[in-house]
Regions:
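A short alpha-helical cap/connector motif
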Residues: 1-127, 131-202
Length: 202
């Protein structure tokens, strides 16, 4: 899978906001990812010779990232958790039209939501992109990381925004013997958001 081709696909698929995420135009899949961050992250996972059978995404908005994961990694099961309070959440049915998925609507920290997500475990890829405060990211990690398969990937979005709490969580994860730090993808072409990628090894 060619990195340039992945990045161009993301650029041409449509951005949620050009100032925040870059891209060629606003609209399309309303992706909330910086193209030269999400592209190498996807390539790393695709090249790992590890089948992504089940994908859990926490914090979905319009579904742009879901669309990309479905397109490039083709997981057989897609589970989405979102409280639907994002102003672009109403676009999700159109963005994800034709993509089979289970949507769990509610706050990711709520016990009922965690229990429902657990019914579909294990997951081979989990993306945490919900509450970006340290406490919220920590709760999501504690609640969902045990649902990750051995060898599965854990991605955390917005790692490069210093005023948020994702960076602190990443520093802690680097000391966690159950996880291997793979890389952090930080844009060199646009204002960075950052994606950190880990793999469960224990």
């Amino acid at each position: 899978m060619n990195l340039e081709d992945i990045e161009n696909y993301v650029l041409e698929a449509g951005s949620d906001d050009l100032a925040t995420f870059g891209g060629f135009f606003e609209g399309g899949i309303h992706c909330q990812q910086v193209p030269d961050e999400i592209a190498p992250c996807i390539k790393e996972i695709a090249d790992a010779d590890f089948e992504i059978r089940s994908f859990l995404e926490i914090g979905v908005a319009a579904g742009g990232t879901t669309f990309l994961i479905s397109h490039f990694l083709n997981p057989g099961q897609i589970i989405l958790i979102d409280d639907n309070k994002h102003h672009k959440a109403g676009l999700r049915p159109e963005v994800l039209k034709g993509i089979d998925r289970v949507e769990i609507i509610g706050r990711s920290e709520d016990e009922a939501i965690i229990f429902e997500a657990a019914e579909y475990q294990p997951y081979d890829l989990i993306l945490i992109d919900g509450d970006h405060l340290y406490k919220g990211v920590k709760i999501d990690f504690i609640s969902y990381s045990l649902m990750l398969s051995l060898g599965g990937f854990l991605a955390l979005h917005d790692s490069a925004i210093p005023e948020w709490g994702v960076g602190r969580m990443i520093r802690e994860l680097k000391q966690n013997e159950d996880f291997e730090f793979i890389d952090e993808y930080v844009s060199k072409k646009h204002k960075p958001c950052g994606i950190a990628l880990f793999r469960r090894v224990k």
